[in-house]
Amino acid sequence: MEAGADLGLRPTGGGVYGTSGRIEKGYRLMGAELESEYNPVEAGLARPKVKAADFIGKEAYLKAREAGNEVSMCTLTVESHTDSNGVERYMQGGNEPILTMDGERITDSHGRVSRVTTAGPGPSVGKYLLLAYLPNELAVVGTDLQVMYMNELFPVKVAAIEGSAFDPEDSRLKG
């Protein structure tokens, strides 16, 4: 490690790829953000063009593109981890419901409940991050919401929509 220090060599672990780095960049994961409940357009994966050749799912994909999305994949920041007993709690990211500041469950017109799909630290942004689908009317940077975790409400804020909380222009990746 010492020999590569001047080249920026540093230790990394699987958590960078599986959680923290993925969440900071807003990358979706099969089985968490990418699941049958949401189509590719809603997941923010629509491409500018659709190839002319036929492919499995093309008809459904074109139908979803035409309908547009009523939800967006968002990155949320946890504003406080302290529960009512003064204990810090860190969400694990698995179906915690997202509520309005009035305590109302958030659902879309299909009855899908907004929930946390992934949670983890975002060391590059200095915040604990969550990924979640939100109806477009709430998918606005700066919107304050709450997450129910262990029967406690924790304040969260929308930080990014269909993008990343860290390096949204991908300038670091592009060099």
What are these regions (language model features)?
Residues 1-175:
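Conserved, structured C-terminal
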